[in-house]
């Protein structure tokens, strides 16, 4: 919508850098990085405009709902039973600033039957517990889904905290809600591994393997604790030893996060190949 200069959304000043962005599309790593940078600035401006009241929420919902329906249709169109499995899903992002409660979750639905017309976004709440509440309500309506935290390595310690999003204690309600909605966590991807960090695993000679270590945010220990899977498992076991429930009993997945809709094993043109 922002790229389409004929749309109402494109008339806002924050949309101008996005105008005609799709007229020329390249799959080079440099193009992907450029588009990513533009989108980050755009997303921040959209959120600020909404918070200030200068952006009409009805217009945002109209654009979001249209995009969501296209996503569902794309999943249905590409689904080939027994050959190629697709899911409708979207990314829920709580923050746009690295290491400042930078929380991302991929919300994936079991199938496309009776999906909601409108998805839950950061404009509804930046608190992941509110996302889980929304997922629970949808589940009661027969719509099953799961959320997968990803890129936890740059969450600033918020991904696997010893308190809830608002700083309160982790109680039984929080634990059951999290375990029910987030049975998986992404452990590695193109933007660095989330398994562990050299500062957290000093006796592991492989702790720096594909870890982000050169960003200033990685020099602050408080940004690391609560951001990595090994540390999360340890924190969960510590809570269990104290007689408390463990919110960090989860399986793991690996991803590309190259945003090109495919794996590097299928085509030489994907950015993951270019990065290699």
Predicted regions and their residues:
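Extended, charged catalytic domains and RNA/DNA-binding interfaces, predominantly
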Residues: 1-272
């Amino acid at each position: 919508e922002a790229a389409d200069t004929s749309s109402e959304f494109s008339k806002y000043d924050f949309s101008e850098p996005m105008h005609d962005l799709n007229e020329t599309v390249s799959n080079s790593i440099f193009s992907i990085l450029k588009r990513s940078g533009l989108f980050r600035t755009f997303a921040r401006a959209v959120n600020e405009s909404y918070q200030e009241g200068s952006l009409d929420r009805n217009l945002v919902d109209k654009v979001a709902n249209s995009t969501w329906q296209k996503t569902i249709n794309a999943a249905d169109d590409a689904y080939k039973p027994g050959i190629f499995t697709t899911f409708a899903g979207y990314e829920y992002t709580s923050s746009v600033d690295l290491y400042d409660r930078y929380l991302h979750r991929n919300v994936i639905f079991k199938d496309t039957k009776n999906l909601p017309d409108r998805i839950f976004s950061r404009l509804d709440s930046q608190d992941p517990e509110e996302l889980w509440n929304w997922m629970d309500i949808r589940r009661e309506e027969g719509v099953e889904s799961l959320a997968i935290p990803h890129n936890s390595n740059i969450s600033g310690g918020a991904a696997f905290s010893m308190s809830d999003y608002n700083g309160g204690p982790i109680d039984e309600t929080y634990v059951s809600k999290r375990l029910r909605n987030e049975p998986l966590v992404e452990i590695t991807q193109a933007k660095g591994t989330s398994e562990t960090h050299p500062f957290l695993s000093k006796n592991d000679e492989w702790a720096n393997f594909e870890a982000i270590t050169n960003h200033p945010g990685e020099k602050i220990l408080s940004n690391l604790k609560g951001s990595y899977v090994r540390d999360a498992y340890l924190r969960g076991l510590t809570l269990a030893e104290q007689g408390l429930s463990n919110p960090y009993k989860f399986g793991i997945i690996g991803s590309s996060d190259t945003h090109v809709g495919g794996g590097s094993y299928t085509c030489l043109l994907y950015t993951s190949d270019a990065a290699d």
